[in-house]
Design a protein with these regions (language model features):
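N-proximal low-complexity "stem/linker" segments adjacent to membrane-targeting elements
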Residues: 1-46
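Acidic helix N-cap motif at the loop->helix transition within catalytic regions
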Residues: 38-41, 63-72, 112-113
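A conserved acidic beta->alpha catalytic loop
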Residues: 46, 50, 58-67, 81, ...
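Conserved beta-strand positions in the Rossmann-like core of class I SAM-dependent methyltransferases
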Residues: 55
Length: 280
C-alpha cells in the first residue's frame, strides 16, 4: 500500500488542488500520533468508514502504531517536530474537504455525534466551527468533576476558516461564528497509571522547555504554591472528590505534573548557568 510520507526535512505534500474528495461525507478527519499503538485502532475504527478522508501524522512511532494505521487509511505522513502546534497545522494542511474534524489518537466517536455532524455538513450549516464536549474515561470510570470537567473545545470547522495557534497546549481558532454540538466524543487518556506517569514526565519536560523559550524564569513560590492551588481548585472547588478513588488519583497526579514542570524549569536554568560558568 502506498503511503504519503513526509518529514520536516522532506515534505512530500500533495497540493490540495491536485487531490479531489470522493462522493462520501465531505469531511476530512485528521489526527496526530506518536507511540499510541494501544489506543489508535479504536480511534481509526470510529471514523474510517464514515468520513471521506482520514489523515494521520505520525512521528516515526516504534510501538506498533505504524503497522496499525495503514489498515484504515493510506494517508499516513511522518513529521517530526517538538512544536505541537506545527504538527497539528501540518495535519490540517493535508486536508482536502471543506469540513475538517480533528481527534486525538486516544479518542473515539460514538454513532450519535457522527450522525449529528453528518446532518450539519449535509445540510446548511449556520456556523463556521463547532465546539464539542469530551467524556473522559479513567480507570474504568467516567470523570464528571474536577479539573477534567467540563472539557470543551472546537473540533469541527470549515477548513478555510480554521488555523492552529498556541504552543504546547495548541488549539484551533476559527475566523467566523462558532456553535456547539449536542453530543459528546469519548476519551481514554491513559491505559494505566504507569502510562500516565510516563506521559506526565514527557509533557512536564516539554512544558518546562516551552516556559523557558518564552522567557519565563523559575520562582520557588511557583514550585511550592501552584501544586497546592491545583489540589484546592480541582478537588475542593470543582468537587473532584465526587469521582471517588480515581478522582483522588487524578488530583494527586495533576499536582505531581505541576510540581515537575516547575522543577524541570529550575533544572534547565541550572544547566544554562553551568554551561555559562564552564565557558570561563
Amino acid at each position: 500500500m502506498d503511503q504519503p510520507v513526509a518529514s520536516n526535512q522532506q515534505k512530500q505534500t500533495l497540493n490540495s488542488e491536485q487531490r479531489t474528495p470522493s462522493d462520501g461525507l465531505p469531511l476530512s478527519v485528521y489526527m496526530i500520533t506518536y507511540n499510541n499503538g494501544v489506543t489508535i485502532e479504536r480511534a481509526l475504527q470510529s471514523v474510517a468508514d464514515w468520513a471521506d478522508e482520514v489523515i494521520v501524522v505520525d512521528s516515526y512511532s516504534t510501538d506498533g502504531a505504524q503497522d496499525i494505521i495503514p489498515r484504515y487509511t493510506e494517508k499516513l505522513y511522518q513529521f517530526e517536530t517538538k512544536d505541537l502546534r506545527e504538527k497539528y497545522q501540518y495535519a490540517h494542511d493535508q486536508c482536502i474537504n471543506p469540513w475538517t474534524l480533528f481527534i486525538d489518537a486516544d479518542e473515539w466517536l460514538m454513532d450519535d455525534i457522527k450522525k449529528e455532524i453528518s446532518t450539519i455538513i449535509r445540510g446548511t450549516p449556520s456556523c463556521d466551527g463547532y465546539i464539542a464536549s469530551r467524556r473522559n474515561m479513567y480507570l474504568g470510570r467516567e470523570i464528571k468533576h474536577g479539573g477534567w470537567y467540563p472539557d470543551r473545545e472546537i473540533r469541527l470547522y470549515r477548513r478555510e476558516k480554521g488555523r492552529w495557534e498556541g504552543g504546547l497546549h495548541a488549539k484551533v481558532t476559527v475566523d467566523g461564528t462558532v456553535g456547539t454540538l449536542k453530543h459528546f466524543y469519548m476519551h481514554t487518556p491513559y491505559a494505566d497509571i504507569a502510562h500516565q506517569i510516563r506521559t506526565i514526565d514527557r509533557y512536564s519536560e516539554a512544558f518546562a522547555e516551552d516556559l523557558r523559550s518564552s522567557g519565563r524564569r523559575f520562582h520557588l513560590v511557583n514550585l511550592i504554591t501552584r501544586p497546592v492551588y491545583r489540589f484546592f481548585r480541582d478537588y475542593i472547588l470543582k468537587r473532584g472528590f465526587l469521582d471517588g478513588t480515581p478522582g483522588f488519583i487524578i488530583v494527586v497526579s495533576t499536582m505531581y505534573y505541576v510540581f515537575m514542570k516547575y522543577a524541570k524549569l529550575w533544572e534547565i536554568e541550572m544547566k544554562e548557568k553551568k554551561q555559562f560558568r564552564d565557558r570561563f
